[in-house]
């Protein structure tokens, strides 16, 4: 009997970054060659990690294993990173490998832990120049997550968020309050500094009769209300002060692990919370524009599994611009067809 080979095994390239099974500075190991019975551990040079990575494969093909190996390399190279995991297994696996020397670097975000809810306020703004970006991104997240959407809904929601951002300690819970409580709305509008935003509330919105106003805000109340009605979500985004500062985590090379287990949170809530977190990381990276020299922006690695669940319209912007802010993405999913066309173009143009 003759066994026919369908392909020829080639010798690994001479320039392949090999580690010899040991920790090697400057290399992130993730595989083994077995040419002619000789096993050699190899990886990717850390300098090449400055480019984004896209990992694709169906369930059981090793995506999570590869993500874990790359993350472990960041841990042992004392680099900062964030993990956004919609399943929970990847996040819990990483927690097991955190060495004692880096335990104090870790922020573990687990919404399912209702006894110890960690605060995360997507509307918390440290730089007043970022208010416009924050408003646009929050609208983008909600738009991505809801099937029915209209221009009037987006118009009112945008001015609602812009008004709330001028008052410290407001949260997403205040969106519905702004649209239903006259006294609260007046207090917020009194704090508004942008003349266009103020005119919307004092002239345009104030001119609407009760019936028209009720019909106009109803879709927002339905959509935002459904999200904040979940006590698990409300315990987190209802806190005016975030327990952690994403920009500080990035600049100091710390670790942020986000466990968004869909089995515990529900698929819709996990998707919105994940999109809000990815958006917060994006905005924090963009705020690094206040560091003049690109080389002074500490490298930070963001890992997003099943990233199509969290990809808003601006995700393409993250992929195309994040590197200059020191944010390096590694994203994974199962099928190319899961990505919206604009995100697909950005992925293949920047990885």
Residue ranges and their predicted role:
Residues 52:
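Walker A (P-loop) ATP-phosphate-binding motif of ABC ATPase nucleotide-binding domains
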Residues 86, 332-338:
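Conserved H-loop
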Residues 41:
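Conserved pre-motif I regulatory segment
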Residues 345-351:
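A short helix-turn-beta junction within AAA+ P-loop NTPase domains corresponding to the substrate/partner-engaging
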Residues 30-38, 46-48, 58-59, 66-327, ...:
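P-loop NTPase motor domains
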Residues 1-30, 231:
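An aromatic-glycine-centered, glycine-rich loop/turn in mixed alpha/beta architecture
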């Amino acid at each position: 009997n003759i066994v026919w080979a369908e392909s020829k095994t080639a010798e690994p390239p001479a320039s392949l970054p090999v580690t010899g099974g040991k920790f090697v500075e400057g290399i992130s190991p993730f595989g083994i060659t077995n040419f002619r019975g000789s096993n050699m551990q190899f990886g990717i040079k850390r300098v090449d990690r400055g480019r984004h990575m896209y990992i694709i494969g169906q369930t059981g093909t090793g995506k999570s294993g590869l993500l874990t190996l790359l993350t472990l390399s960041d841990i042992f190279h004392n680099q900062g990173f964030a993990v956004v995991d919609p399943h929970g297994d990847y996040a819990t696996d990483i927690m097991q490998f955190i060495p004692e020397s880096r335990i104090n670097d870790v922020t573990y975000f687990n919404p399912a832990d209702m006894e110890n809810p960690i605060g995360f306020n997507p509307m918390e703004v440290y730089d007043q120049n970022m208010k416009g970006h924050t408003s646009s991104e929050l609208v983008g997240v909600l738009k991505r997550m809801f099937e029915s959407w209209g221009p009037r809904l987006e118009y009112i929601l945008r001015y609602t968020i812009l008004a709330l951002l001028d008052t410290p300690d407001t949260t997403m819970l205040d969106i519905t309050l702004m649209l239903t409580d006259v006294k609260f709305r007046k207090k917020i509008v009194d704090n508004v500094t942008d003349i266009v935003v103020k005119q919307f509330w004092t002239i345009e919105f104030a001119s609407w009769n009760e019936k028209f106003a009720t019909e106009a805000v109803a879709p927002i109340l339905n959509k935002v209300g459904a999200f904040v009605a979940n006590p698990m979500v409300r315990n987190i985004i209802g806190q005016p002060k975030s327990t952690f500062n994403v920009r500080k985590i990035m600049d100091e090379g710390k670790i942020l692990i986000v466990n968004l287990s869909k089995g515990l949170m529900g698929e819709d809530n996990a998707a919105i919370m994940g999109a809000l977190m990815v958006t917060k990381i994006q905005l924090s990276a963009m705020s690094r524009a206040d560091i003049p020299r690109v080389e002074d922006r500490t490298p930070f690695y963001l890992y997003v599994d099943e990233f199509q669940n969290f990809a808003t319209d601006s995700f393409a912007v993250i992929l195309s611009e994040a590197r200059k802010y020191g944010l390096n993405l590694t994203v994974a999913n199962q099928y190319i067809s899961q990505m919206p066309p604009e995100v697909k173009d950005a992925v293949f143009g920047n990885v």
